[in-house]
Amino acid sequence: MNAHASTAPHCRAGTSLSDSRLAQDLPYDYSTLLENVLDVSHVPYTHHLTVSNRANGGPVELSVLEPGVTSSGFSGMWLEGPRQGKLGSQSTKFVAPGLMYHSLEAKGLGTTLTVVFATPVAPGRSRLLARFPFRFNAAPPRFIIKNTPRWIQHQGQNGVLEDDVVFLAQQEAFVAAAEAQGQTYAQACFMPLRQDAYVLAFRQWLTRFTQGGSPWQPGALLAAHSTSPTRDQLLDRYWSHTFNCTSCSAALKNTRTASIVAAITGVAAALALTACLAARLILPAAALPVSPLALLAAVAACAFAWVKLQAIEKGFLVGPSIPKRNLITSKKANTSTKIRLV
């Protein structure tokens, strides 16, 4: 088709927008990936406290523009736009077979895009190639984003993808089982609202122009979901992203080195503290070369650094088992409760 020769307008060379990028392998099919990124209505709920908030949720009226769904894809418009209209209208374009982008000219804020190339890898597996071009009118957000290390940006983007992963893997297995029993996608999934217009348009394109909607042999997708993945497999970051990312793999290596240094330094400081305390017991009047309090502070600092570095290292390996949307914070008690729900 034509996506190989196409890019979103603001991604072309010579534009004035800055750009953030991400590549990640995902444990669900290319079609499920595109369906998910086209669906704007789920964002305030699934991605609560990562990139959105439930308070921004509400009716979503999407329109597929003329000439509708063609072999080249389709275009759409959300007139109200995100955050209950506070940012202005958002346009969407699907360029067959694997490119889609949302474009938002936010009122008084600037231009932001979400651009996704979805690539089939194997039945039940896909690769996301995403770009996030932006141009903010205000200087502070431009400065913050441009000066945030890429690996920190990637960990945030990993987290957004992990918000969906449990739902999407289970949804895909359900749909594959229904289709194996002779149901169509429309029979397996009830989507009567205009918020589903983009998903329905994409599924219509799959059915009309891809000889049945899947690049795989019949039954291949169902076979790919014959065993349920573990939570750690679904939330894997190392093999799905870090291993192949120059920024994140280098940061992981540096984090592990710093962790070793913190551990060795902490042990050395603890041994020195023990020696100082022993010397004080043996020779109470003798002057000590180093203050025991300074050594104790060094031990505490190294222990703190080691714990933090271990947490950073884990962020390169696997995502958190509890999504942010399931962290309920009590303002009165200033405490948080973690609920183990998908």
Cite the ranges covered by each PLM segment.
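C-terminal catalytic domain of Rieske-type non-heme iron oxygenases
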Residues: 2-342
